Amino acid sequence: MDSDTVTADISLSSFVYALLLLPFLLILKHIFLKPPPLPPGPYPWPIIGNLLQLGKNPHVKLASLAKLHGPLMSLRLGTQLMVVASSPAAALEVLKTHDRTLSGRYVSSSLSVKDPKLNHLSLAFAKECTNNWKNLRTICRTEMFSGKAMESHVELRERKVMELVEFLATKEGEVVKVMDLVFTTICNILSNTFFSMDLCDFEREGLKDFIYRAAELGATPNLSDFYPILDGLNLHGSKKKSKEALGRILATWEGTLKERRKQKNPGSSHRDLLEAFLEIRFEDDQINQVILELFSAGADTSTLTIEWAITQLIRNPDVMYKLRDELTKIIGESPVRESHLPHLPYLQACVKETLRLHPPAPLLLPHRAMETCQVMGYTIPKDSQVFVNIWAMGRDPKVWDDPLSFTPERFLDSKLEFKGNDFEYIPFGAGRRICPGMALGARQVPLVLATLVHLFDWSLPDNMDSAQIDMEEWLVITLRKENPLRLVPKVRK
Ligand code: HEM
């Protein structure tokens, strides 16, 4: 046998051995290199998964499910996978350690922008954190939320709040839907920052009702969110309804946009966001998209926080008394100014305590896994929806003493801030997707709240006692429409 034949025999036998070993190697790979499992969660039913388990207050139900399944759990909603983080440690993993991968946005099919050009120019609904999204955040920060921009709008915010006070004063003794009026004020603060004009009226319906309607449609789950294959069928007709509602919102500033495009020099006494957008040659569609998103993200969140703060103050007269006392000592008889806010620690603590118990976005906005990743020893597959249940974290007895009581004092000697670094307390989120409007929210909410508490006495109508305002989360919104929470403001003499 010559050496060539021996070499050929050896290679042939190595090949045969390798072939025989292959199944074993594959089995070993399967056993040892198997990706970690999905996060634990309730058993999913065939086809519907866990859809029926969420109910009408998903954050409340998810909080109780997390007690059974742990701080990182997964549920199936139709064909979609939902992952929920419910502890500060899990929130830190999602919003800091894996922020790059998990900062995609999951957008409901009824809200999703079909035009790819607009999708690239979206802020809250941008599916990825693209350069366009970064640029948009930078423009909004520079023009609206930076220290300089915030200072340039102080007088505007104070004026709008005084208009609310003047209107309320004309209603002495009457039953008033105060929170509708607060919503009007917040919308007008925003619309003046965008266009230097009011878009809402205390007496008439208009923009605010269209925004309610659009928000309601956006929050209503759509079957194609759970079964994307049904997307083209538009079973609820919700896309048509959202399009109508959005069309009516856009119509409220269409004329202004046209006018301002024609003007060479806008002539407004202070710069607004529209001026910045026109300078960088944004088209109408692009401007509409961003302003729409800023309205939807900024108006309801601030109003709900004020509404809950007032509700908690009525429920807790001692806290109301202490807050009034602080306001009287620091402000005296004059109207509240933004320059007073840094000197009102108890007011700031009341706002923080309200955001702990009643975060207006209890699950943040839905994030999306842009790639498959491993978190806390579990796999989160690409395109899963990822939520952080800050409502559950705000009421967790492992994190807070006596978590259900409204005790602003807990924030007085504490260094806890809502700026996205303390993961037990993130009402504005954290990481790349943190709320860009935090600076504005953190000024307009205490300004309006302090004004309402300082200038008015709050009492309930005779036929309602404080037990009746023992509301469940999100019921406030329902109350507003079906059985509005009517508080009687009495102007203090
Ligand atoms: C009390 C007031 C507010 C609270 C509690 C709040 C809270 C939040 C939260 C929790 C998020 C989602 C963060 C995430 O998904 O991780 C968010 C996003 C957002 N907020 Fe706010 N917000 C408030 C006021 C405002 C205001 C006044 C504006 C602007 C006018 C605003 C504009 C936005 C936008 C555009 C986003 C989407 C950001 C993105 O996806 O990149 N918010 N906010």
Residue map of PLM features:
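Cytochrome P450
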Residues: 2-22, 76-83, 148-159, 169-192, ...
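Cytochrome P450 substrate-recognition site 1
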Residues: 35-51, 60-156, 177, 182-189, ...
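Conserved cytochrome P450 K-helix E-x-x-R motif and the immediately C-terminal K′/meander segment
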Residues: 51-70, 251, 334-377, 387, ...
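Conserved cytochrome P450 catalytic core segment spanning the I/J/K helices
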Residues: 145-149, 173, 187, 219-224, ...
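Central I-helix of cytochrome P450 enzymes
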Residues: 186, 190, 194, 245-253, ...
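Cytochrome P450 heme-binding "Cys pocket" and the immediately downstream C-terminal segment
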Residues: 317-319, 386, 438-478
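Cytochrome P450 heme-thiolate "Cys pocket" and heme-binding signature region
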Residues: 376, 414-445, 472-474
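Conserved cytochrome P450 K-helix/beta-meander segment immediately N-terminal to the heme-binding cysteine loop
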Residues: 388-417
